[in-house]
C-alpha cells in the first residue's frame, strides 16, 4: 500500500492542524483514511495498526515518501515485527506515489475540503466520517487505472482500463 499525509492547514502551514493519513492499495485501489492530530511516527504507527486490522486482505508492504514521519526507526521496527515490507519512493520524485496522491484528492479532500481543521474533537469527527464512508468508497465507488499514454503530434492520448470498484 502507498501511504501519504494530507495537511488540513488551510492557506498556511504554521501552527497546529489535522493531517489525514491516506493508504491506497496498489493492486486494487482499496483506500483507507485516518485523521491524525499531529504528524509524528507514534500516531502513524497506531493508525497503520488500526487500518491493518480492518483490511479485507493482508498488508504485505508499505511504500512511503521521504518524510521524517515515515523514514524513522520506530516505523521500521514496527514493520519488521509485523513482517511488513517498508519501501520508500525515490528522492525528489513527486510522481512516485500517483495512486495515493489521486485518492488524496478524490477521497480526503472531497470529504474534508481544503479549510483549516484542528483539535481533538475535529479529528474524532473526521475519523467517524472516514469510517462511515470507507465501505461506500471501496465497495461502490468505481475508479480506473491509466494503462497507456501516447503523444500523437501535439496531442496526448490516454488509455484507461474499465472502471471497477476496489473490492
Where are the model-predicted features located?
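Charged, gly/pro-enriched flexible loop segments at helix/strand junctions
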Residues: 134-167
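Generic recognition of stable, solvent-exposed alpha-helical segments in well-folded globular domains
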Residues: 1, 43-46, 66, 70-74, ...
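Short, flexible loop/turn elements at secondary-structure junctions
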Residues: 5-9, 25-27, 38-40, 68
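Active-site beta-loop-alpha junctions of metal-dependent nucleic acid enzymes
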Residues: 16, 24, 33-56
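RNase H-like two-metal-ion nuclease catalytic core shared by retroviral integrases
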Residues: 64-66, 70-79, 86-112, 153-156
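Mobile genetic element proteins and their domesticated derivatives, centered on retroelements
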Residues: 4, 23, 29, 48, ...
Amino acid at each position: 500500500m502507498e501511504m501519504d499525509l494530507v495537511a488540513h492547514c488551510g492557506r498556511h502551514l504554521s501552527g497546529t492542524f489535522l493531517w489525514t493519513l491516506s493508504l491506497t492499495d496498489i493492486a486494487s485501489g482499496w483506500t483507507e483514511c485516518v485523521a491524525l492530530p499531529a504528524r509524528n511516527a507514534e500516531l502513524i504507527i497506531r493508525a497503520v495498526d488500526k487500518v491493518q486490522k480492518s483490511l479485507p486482505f493482508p498488508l504485505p508492504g508499505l511504500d512511503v515518501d521521504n518524510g521524517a514521519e515515515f523514514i524513522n526507526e520506530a516505523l521500521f521496527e514496527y514493520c519488521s515485527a509485523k513482517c511488513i515490507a517498508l519501501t520508500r519512493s525515490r528522492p525528489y520524485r513527486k510522481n512516485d506515489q500517483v495512486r495515493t496522491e489521486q485518492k488524496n484528492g478524490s477521497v480526503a479532500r472531497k470529504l474534508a475540503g481544503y479549510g483549516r481543521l484542528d483539535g481533538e474533537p475535529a479529528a474524532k469527527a473526521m475519523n467517524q466520517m472516514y469510517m462511515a464512508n470507507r465501505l461506500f468508497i471501496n465497495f461502490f465507488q468505481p475508479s480506473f487505472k491509466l494503462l497507456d499514454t501516447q503523444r500523437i503530434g501535439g496531442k496526448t492520448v490516454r488509455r484507461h482500463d474499465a472502471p471497477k470498484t476496489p473490492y
